[in-house]
Amino acid sequence: MISPDDQFGRMMVENLEQRGCELLGIHAHPTLEAQKKRMEDLLVAKEGQQAKAESLTMCDIYQSKLDGEGERTRIEKLELFDEFEEWALLQSHYCLTLGALLQSADSPIKDLAI
């Protein structure tokens, strides 16, 4: 989870704590950039390697990455979704962070991206 200090984030954290699910490290890495740096720091590169990480909110992934062959359009046709703004707000508080150790600048995944 990210953005625990905005109004919606505080409400989410409080609701989880009331259910006994305290997010112990949430304030140590509260932003996309902090999550990306955390991943890069965890990936200990050896000589000749490069740590690469990328982080996106789930809302960003839905809006910009889930377009292959009309997948987003197909999903949206399955059920009328009248609460998109609330859903987008919720999804903007979750992220996916991907990291890899690249062997060289010529690595086939040198342009690592989500």
Where are these regions (language model features)?
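Alpha-helical subdomain
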Residues: 1-114
